[in-house]
């Protein structure tokens, strides 16, 4: 369907008019599946504006699987009656969304004593393997609500961390942010040819502004400001910044042992 015009929240009546046909035609769209007219109507005007930003991409893009994004960390609490249903549906083992995630980097109980050997599946040639995590900093809005200044501020905030990684692993920062604003040059800026080369090598992400799902959610706004990646000297360790999460931290390697990739990420 065509994208809805303007950024102003729909009335509860119009929301129902737009979502009812999607619910019928696209039952796997979790956003519209759990959008409730009475709940939406009961929100304050201010909360309704934010909630509309959270759910708009699922209405603009009926074939979405999730179709919604929190705009700031607190949205998961503010709009818990909605998000708990969506998240519970996605994580089938926790339909009521009552469990709390606990980080566990111990892989010793997985596979054969922590060894995950893909050659045991009969594979003869080495595979390109990747393990990654997404991270967002609570001091910032989530990507859908960040403006250009905040995206640039986030990039600058990360520079010290990238410098520390470069000292340990070598490498470089590859930024497509044209400038830092107020006449401040970006010392890590790369030209279009270098950017395309990194995309072709699967090291950098593609133009987000061409993605209708991210565009509708506000996640691709201000492209290409605040976007880029840090890459180690051997090109195996990569951190994207400014994509669908503020940070996507990954390790890539050719071989058979996935546990080795996981250990390097850890």
Task: Locate predicted features.
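Long, Pro/Ser/Thr-rich low-complexity/intrinsically disordered regulatory tracts in eukaryotic proteins
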Residues: 2-266
């Amino acid at each position: 369907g065509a994208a809805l015009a303007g950024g102003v929240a729909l009335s509860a009546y119009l929301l129902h008019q737009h979502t009812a046909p999607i619910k019928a035609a696209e039952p796997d769209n979790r956003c519209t599946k759990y959008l409730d007219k009475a709940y939406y109507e009961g929100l304050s005007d201010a909360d309704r504006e934010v909630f509309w930003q959270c759910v708009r991409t699922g209405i603009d893009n009926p074939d979405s699987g999730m179709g919604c994004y929190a705009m700031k960390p607190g949205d998961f609490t503010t709009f818990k009656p909605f998000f708990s249903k969506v998240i519970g549906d996605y994580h089938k083992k926790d339909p009521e969304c009552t469990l709390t995630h606990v980080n566990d980097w111990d892989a010793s109980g997985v596979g054969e004593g922590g060894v995950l050997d893909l050659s045991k599946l009969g594979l003869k040639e080495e595979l390109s393997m990747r393990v990654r995590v997404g991270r967002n900093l609570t001091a910032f809005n989530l990507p859908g609500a960040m403006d250009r200044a905040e995206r640039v501020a986030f990039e600058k905030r990360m520079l010290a961390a990238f410098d520390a990684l470069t000292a340990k692993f070598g490498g470089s920062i590859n930024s497509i942010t044209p400038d830092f604003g107020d006449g401040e040059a970006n010392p890590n800026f790369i030209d279009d040819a270098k950017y395309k080369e990194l995309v072709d090598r699967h090291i950098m992400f593609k133009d987000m502004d061409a993605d209708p799902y991210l565009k509708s959610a506000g996640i691709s706004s201000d492209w290409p400001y605040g976007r880029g990646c840090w890459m180690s000297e051997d090109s195996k360790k990569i951190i994207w910044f400014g994509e669908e999460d503020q940070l996507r931290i990954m390790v890539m390697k050719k071989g058979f042992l996935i546990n080795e990739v996981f250990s390097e990420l850890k």
